[in-house]
Amino acid sequence: MNILVTGAKGMVGTALCNNLKNIRDGKNKTRPALNIEEIYEYDLDSTPAELDEYCQKADFVFNLAGVNRPENSEDFMKGNFGFASDLLNCLKKHNNKTTIMLSSSIQATLAGRFGNSEYGRSKKAGEELFFQYAQETGAKVAVYRFVNLMGHSRPKYNSAVSTFCWAVANDEPFTVNDRSTELELLYIDDLVEGMFDLLEGKEQHCEFDGVETVLKADGHYCCVPVTHKVTLGEIVDLLQEFKAQPTTLMMPKMPDGSFTKKLYSLYLTYLPTDKFKYALKMNVDNRGSFTELVHTADCGQVSINISKPGITKGQHWHNSKWELFIVVAGHGLIQERNINTGETVEFEVSGDKIEAVHMIPGWTHNIINLSETENLVTVMTCNEIFNPNHPDTFFEPV
């Protein structure tokens, strides 16, 4: 399959082309039905001759080209309707009736606040042109009316989310005019997966009730239904939480598919390189060190413990707190004793064979570095963040 992507250097085009190449090159094996040979990338610096060649050879067309912020309103029609005409005429010239996807906008509904949108009118005209082309040629046309897109793009241009991510990550000032303003957002990775579905003939269809998407199996339009409705206030509050994470160590709740998970990934792409690395607080004494790595709201914390040769650490028990000790370097011994029955167990552990050992509530425990020359390095997970006002930790030699 040869695929033509117009607007290949835009936010969507870049992400789509990168991921199409992953499939083509065998790096992404999640879509075994797709056999991609060539990816033709067309953008503003391409030539009419290249467009002509690509339209002749393409087995599928993603038309992402368009104008978002022209110098004058007339350029909306020229950029969004005019190029669409050129593209379709070129396909007609070569009698190429391959499937073609059109990237339109929710503004093309011309409903509600979009009633006077010049951008929406130009997108609507492009849609009508594509539907007419489908009737004339019998070619399959897939028109997507995208909501606000959320991906790495130029700040202070066409996306409030990108602007806020950039500003917070780079300590730049920003203004939120109304925290209650709600956005419906489509994340770039979800959009790309939707395009893969389209390539496989598994796209979802819809109609529109005003600006609301209504899934419908025989709908006139196509859609990627995985969107998120969030307020500007919620977005900036999350971003401030992300920014504080290297200091607080608190990792926000990020369930799979959640808006928070997607926003955090996007936020990180705006970090300046000098913020890629940050210091952690090492609690150091003559026995070694203990460093907390990550805190979570509902799964406790993860730490790294380093014990010097011959050192014993621990010698305490907990009522409800439990831990996992995972030695990743060195040679050690973990001992545990039930404080009520006196039963004892011990486990020899080594970085050469990584194993996890439970520290059970009600069992006092320790960890001993058996080496005379090497440090013992242990990853420790705990079901709660340490609270000095309620430590639940009681000294008791094993």
PLM features per residue range, with description:
Residues D274-Q315:
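A short glycine-rich, His/Asp/Glu-containing loop-to-beta-strand
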Residues N338-W363:
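Short acidic-glycine-tyrosine-enriched beta hairpin
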Residues T341-E343, I368-V398:
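Double-stranded beta-helix
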Residues M1-G26:
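N-terminal Rossmann NAD(P)H-binding glycine-rich loop of SDR-like oxidoreductase domains
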Residues F131-L183, I188-K202, I235:
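NAD(P)-dependent short-chain dehydrogenase/reductase
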Residues S85-K124, T137, A142:
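Conserved Rossmann-fold NAD(P)-dependent oxidoreductase catalytic core, especially the SDR/UDP-sugar
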Residues D197, G201-K281:
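Mid/C-terminal beta-alpha module of Rossmann-like enzyme folds, strongest
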Residues L44-D86, C90-K93, Q107-F114:
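NAD(P)H-binding glycine-rich loop region in Rossmannoid oxidoreductase-like domains
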